[in-house]
């Protein structure tokens, strides 16, 4: 309604529609009450749809376009948003038309497990007297995770003795903090722990016993804080059991 690159207006009508075709394709100044398709399609829709600036209209609120501008697998690799989130597929553009190669409109992202698993590499091992977990942002053109502050990547390490008794538990959370997580009267900018594109975060946990077992898990949280066992909001991506 405000145009590509402009801050969206708060909408008071048709809230039940959510995002529609017009959210991205609408062009300022066009009277769609007279739209009949056909030749109108050439002029009725914004030609900049699908550009990074188009996506940034809404997604810049979470800093994702800024992250992309410095990302090893993003702008620096010549990739744009639609390369990952609107891949080319063969499908009919409209009912009754023959399939052809066009952009997918399913927008795979953090709710899509296959897309999520392409984003990272995970390694867990016992090195000397500590557990070392490495999480690498191997394929994302922005931070991992990004978008809403609710998103989180969590590494959990549990150390047990030879009898299975829990000795230690450590959790590393990669996220951008909520305002409620800042220090009282904090006047400095918050510092996130999201993993930048192409970078690795380490989670190190010391071992204080001679032998036992380490349990390592990697969770993705669609909304944090949520329980690791929440079937809707949490997904266990990796699980390792390492004797030492």
Regions picked out by a protein language model, each given a short descriptive name:
Residues 216:
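Conserved glycine-centered beta->alpha loop in an early N-terminal alpha/beta scaffold
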Residues 211-213:
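Extracellular Ig-like/FN3 beta-sandwich strand-entry sites
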Residues 2-184, 188-200, 205-209, 223-244:
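Primarily the internal scaffold of c-type cytochrome electron-transfer domains
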